[in-house]
Amino acid sequence: MKISDGNWLIQPGLNLIHPLQVFEVEQQDNEMVVYAAPRDVRERTWQLDTPLFTLRFFSPQEGIVGVRIEHFQGALNNGPHYPLNILQDVKVTIENTERYAEFKSGNLSARVSKGEFWSLDFLRNGERITGSQVKNNGYVQDTNNQRNYMFERLDLGVGETVYGLGERFTALVRNGQTVETWNRDGGTSTEQAYKNIPFYMTNRGYGVLVNHPQCVSFEVGSEKVSKVQFSVESEYLEYFVIDGPTPKAVLDRYTRFTGRPALPPAWSFGLWLTTSFTTNYDEATVNSFIDGMAERNLPLHVFHFDCFWMKAFQWCDFEWDPLTFPDPEGMIRRLKAKGLKICVWINPYIGQKSPVFKELQEKGYLLKRPDGSLWQWDKWQPGLAIYDFTNPDACKWYADKLKGLVAMGVDCFKTDFGERIPTDVQWFDGSDPQKMHNHYAYIYNELVWNVLKDTVGEEEAVLFARSASVGAQKFPVHWGGDCYANYESMAESLRGGLSIGLSGFGFWSHDIGGFENTAPAHVYKRWCAFGLLSSHSRLHGSKSYRVPWAYDDESCDVVRFFTQLKCRMMPYLYREAARANARGTPMMRAMMMEFPDDPACDYLDRQYMLGDNVMVAPVFTEAGDVQFYLPEGRWTHLWHNDELDGSRWHKQQHGFLSLPVYVRDNTLLALGNNDQRPDYVWHEGTAFHLFNLQDGHEAVCEVPAADGSVIFTLKAARTGNTITVTGAGEAKNWTLCLRNVVKVNGLQDGSQAESEQGLVVKPQGNALTITL
């Protein structure tokens, strides 16, 4: 909400009350409690007829400081609440002096100044990183609508940039933006978002989570240009400041607090193909796609059935349309015999025409209005109603339907929708409708995830989800939603992917080729390269098919090349996936996350790091012109082998079988021996590639097993002109390519052979000594 009117005034109809003077400080168990008055209350006369704010400082985990500013403590506080991992035994330090009261957890502390001028400062090792000054937090009474709000304004320093707040398609840097965290089905080309997360981080190495599931209004360097303002309709405001000091460390703490991204199964990293949305399809159509892919030597790993696997006007009752798919169980069995995994579309709604609608209504499984009638409308499906997942019996009914599909052979679900959840309703468990609007996405996806966890096992569970709330990163994968089939939408999709990665989500995808309309062949081919260098890759559209031969012959070449490349990259990619699971670092990440000390990376949103070591710059032009920035170091193209210096911008032109994909120096990269499948034994026949190992440096490569654990580790250390290579663990028939090295002066315990990319060394055991 807008509170101020310029620098001197406030918006008409608003009354503001601020904490201005510390009255008393108490220690209550592990909390520091500060009582603050909105005026000087040193004289007893002024202690009457005045509000008194209660500020609670606490720590749910080391390096995280919680702040709760309370006005009236007797207000209702119905759930839902975010499922946070709150620890009870966090070591904290509380100091209460004449000048200030300070609460410390880890290296992070919150300090409240006493005396004439109010200030709340957050410090890392004694150095201020942010905070709020006098009259920059407090209580808002809106006489226009008789509503009350709490707000906070945290300072932004010179050059400080803000990121996150969910999957947003606007500029990557949030400075200057107004953000309302209210899930909406708005596509990728608007300010609306499917996945609103009231968490942001800055390039100063800290994050802030506002602990309110309802709509939180952010003014990010907009209303007050040097502050992040956030407000919520409530009698209290609770937020957490999360220490880094690096962006990766912030996400490590944040996902430890809100939940780690689960590790998707290896097969999910392959190529997904769908029926598209409103196209006509039956088993013959599906077979023509799958056989066409095989005939053209196009690797395919997952086939997805979109909405019309069910009868029209009945979504979702989980019954196959018998006219289109008379033998679904047999069809699925035949498809799986071809080595495919099967995904089907679902959503959390039910059309009135469905034969089960009356049963669901009578049993109380659908969301009701306060007067007891069903909440219904005619958008999406006629007479549409919403499953009430706060009713355990409704959850069981829904889950049993999904389990029946799994028993039929379905491997995973596309959990679509879940954004347009109304507020003029009465939930079964009495949940606050304002809070449930966003949180519904969490309980919906959690329900479906648990079905897969209980049936196929957590190690095989994967979703393709569109809506999300805080904590939903535990249920991957998430995709960007409805985008147009043009370069602008391709770029805005990338911004959304980087943004959600900066919000704690480890795995992300997008509709390759665009969803709305049909892309020209050149857009499709550029998007395929980008899509197959994303964590997850799906060909999907609305009114037209997305098989590559529907565009042109070269599209088949592009899909083949990049699918095979991704399959070969799986030893590297899956180890990065395991790191996302372990620490919350997204596989696709903004450049500023990997290079936080390079200010040139702060605003980059048309390129990204794919894991720790590989920079990808998608091409957004038909002609192939692309500009990209490389940070400090010497970078080598993954397959062209050309080398570029970092700390500068580069301009290039690429054909459709190419784009800038550069590996940073001092990297040991593992490529697999299979270009047809993502799920194979990665530690057999592994081709390690060593890129520009500098004197005094060591490169380490960890090869994962199917569960993400490390099964083999290769290290290369350089001293002068000598490179010592040692391996530990289980590996067979591995080789080492010294990129852009054509000959060596000496080699111990191995043999060598020339290749276009560099000298290839084959060890006799698990150790090598190379003299350059």
Swiss-Prot record:
Family annotation (Gene3D superfamilies): Glycosidases (3.20.20.80), glycosyl hydrolase (family 31) (2.60.40.1760), Golgi alpha-mannosidase II (2.60.40.1180)
pH dependence comment: Optimum pH is 7.0.
UniProt KW Signal keyword: no
EC number(s) recorded for this UniProt protein: 3.2.1.177
One Pfam family here: Gal_mutarotas_2
Function: Can catalyze the transfer of alpha-xylosyl residue from alpha-xyloside to xylose, glucose, mannose, fructose, maltose, isomaltose, nigerose, kojibiose, sucrose and trehalose.
Protein name, per record: Alpha-xylosidase
Organism listed in the record: Escherichia coli (strain K12)
Gene field: yicI
